[in-house]
Regions:
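Active-site-proximal catalytic alpha-helix in oxidoreductases
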Residues: 175-203, 207-220
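Helix-loop-beta segment of a Rossmann-like dinucleotide-binding subdomain
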Residues: 133-143, 193-203, 258-269
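NAD(P)+-binding Rossmann beta1-loop-alpha1 motif at the extreme N-terminus of oxidoreductases
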Residues: 1-51
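N-terminal glycine-rich dinucleotide-binding loop that anchors FAD/FMN and/or NAD(P) in oxidoreductases
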Residues: 43-60, 185
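Hydrophobic anchor at the start of a short beta-strand
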Residues: 3, 25-26, 97, 118, ...
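NAD(P)-dependent Rossmann-like dehydrogenase/reductase catalytic/cofactor-binding core
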Residues: 217-220, 224-308
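Rossmann-fold dinucleotide-binding core
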Residues: 105-183, 187
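Rossmann-like NAD(P)(H) cofactor-binding subdomain of soluble oxidoreductases
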Residues: 52-135
């Protein structure tokens, strides 16, 4: 398959590297000094928890020309950058487009490209980019699928990821999956902003972490009451004591180890515009559906000097 990864941040670079190492025909769209670095020295990715640095000589292009056709394009941009890519995608001949990352307006985005086969995905990798390399943790797991009611893309997904090391979770209702993901990550982002990016300040603050969970539950409740599914299904019983205990253990681990910086605060502190837009749009969803979310609003107020 001929694949383009449109965007060369942490997620895009990990995706391109993994597909490339599986023998896929992959091209990476990158620009500026970072593109030149990859051309000269290869795409270098350092695994946070090992001494290993992979080097991948992936072809790089600076733009997507209208007459160049790919079997699939993965658009790996920040939520705030997606609109700027729509005209380019619309003009290109490629039919299969996968938007990877945070998104609470999946249905509207798909409607903006009616001639395309639109999928959405979320990959479990995180980290940061340095001038000459990416430093990250990559769990090689991706959740991917289309909107509920759209034609199944299971066969296409199998073809894309066949032979790779990815654990692929096919999700035929990505709109609800991404709504739920936003309802989980935004309260965690509030915690990052409260601590100026140093989550270790909260490692013993069980009361605050409990409020983070309360805000997540408010978000899930609003999503469920609006007629959407809670996804992944493991979170469906989100009002149970078991769910609270599981979340508390997770957040304590994040705050006590380097996982918090790598998986949460690195991105939150470097993508304030994206987190602000995500917060704005999911609150609009809450308001349109008459939801109450007082704990969410209180945590937001405490993080207010960062959010725009």
């Amino acid at each position: 398959m001929k694949i383009l990864v449109y965007g060369a941040g942490v997620l895009g670079c990990n995706l391109a590297r993994n597909l490339f190492h599986a023998g896929k025909d992959v091209t990476l769209l990158a620009r500026g000094n970072w593109a030149e670095e990859i051309r000269k020295n290869g795409l270098r990715i350092k695994d946070q928890f090992s001494l290993r640095t992979s080097v991948s000589n992936i072809p790089v292009v600076p733009e997507l020309a209208p007459n160049v056709r790919y079997d699939v394009i993965f658009v790996v941009l920040r939520y705030t950058q997606l609109d700027s890519a729509l005209e380019t995608l619309r003009a290109n001949q490629t039919k299969n487009i996968v938007f990877v990352g945070n998104n609470v307006q999946a249905r509207a985005l798909a409607a903006a490209l009616p001639e395309k086969n639109i999928l959405f995905a979320f990959a479990l990798s995180a980290g940061h980019r340095e001038p000459d390399r990416v430093v990250s943790i990559d769990l090689k797991k991706i959740t991917i699928g289309q909107l509920r009611g759209a034609v199944s893309n299971a066969e296409l997904i199998g073809e894309i990821f066949g032979g790779t090391k990815y654990k692929v979770v096919y999700e035929p209702n990505m709109e609800d999956y991404l709504l739920c993901h936003a309802a989980f990550v935004m309260p965690a982002a509030f915690a990052c902003y409260k601590t100026d990016g140093d989550l270790k300040k909260l490692r013993r603050n069980t009361v605050y972490l409990g409020r983070v969970i309360d805000a997540n539950i408010e978000g899930y409740r609003a999503i469920r009451n609006a007629g959407h599914d809670i996804l992944p299904k493991a979170d469906a019983d989100f009002e149970s004591e078991k769910y609270r205990k599981t979340c508390l253990r997770f957040f304590k681990l994040m705050c006590a180890t380097s996982l918090g910086k790598l998986c949460a605060s690195d991105h939150a502190m470097n993508a304030i515009d994206e987190m602000s837009a995500l917060n704005r749009d999911i609150k609009r969803f809450f308001d349109e559906n008459g939801a109450a979310y007082p704990v969410w609003q209180a945590l937001e107020a405490e993080a207010g000097r960062y959010l725009r």
